[in-house]
Amino acid sequence: MEQPIQPSQHNTKQKRHKSRQRQAAPNVISQIIFASRWLQLPIYLGLIVVQGLYAYKFMKSLWELMTNLQSMDANMIMLAVLNLIDVVMIANLLVMVIVGGYEIFVSKLRTKDHPDEPEWLSHVNASVLKVKLSMSIISISSIHLLQTFVNAANMDEKTMMWQLFLHLGFLVSAVAMAYTDKILYSTSHKGH
């Protein structure tokens, strides 16, 4: 014979059911938010396409340098080489953004014990990536500045001045970011 449910038992079951419903809603929202990181995947795949375009640009510029070498003076050769270096540095920047960004924001890369794994990938985090990116941007800016000064006779003075200011802005920003990271790191590790 089945015993009737006491009012106190019924209230307890209702409370547990309502509690589970309240917990389920934030859990679903959390899962949706967490899964939204995969929306970045097409962006990183697009950057891989851009990297392919830079590889094409590099090969085209290299071919032009080789086929026109006889008609080029030393300055023209230097500008062509600096252009090739610029393309390489931008491609390196793309690799850092693609690999580091995917690793930090989307999903872990499963490259453990891979012989070609970059050294920095084992300890990549937002701070390391930020420093590497700022150093790459400064390096690319340096190459552009060097190209400008090698070609100074054909450049407007105002353009050269603005490129120099922009480069100095990159330098100041990098120093400020490094200082901020240092302060944040020392503050977060004080009690340890």
Curated annotation (Swiss-Prot):
Protein name (record): UPF0114 protein PM1258
Membrane-related topology note: Multi-pass membrane protein
Organism: Pasteurella multocida (strain Pm70)
Keyword Metal-binding set for record: no
PANTHER family: UPF0114 PROTEIN YQHA (PTHR38596:SF1)
Broad class of the protein's primary localization: membrane
GO cellular component, one term: plasma membrane
Region of interest (Disordered), ranges: 1-23
Transmembrane segments: 38-58, 79-99, 160-180
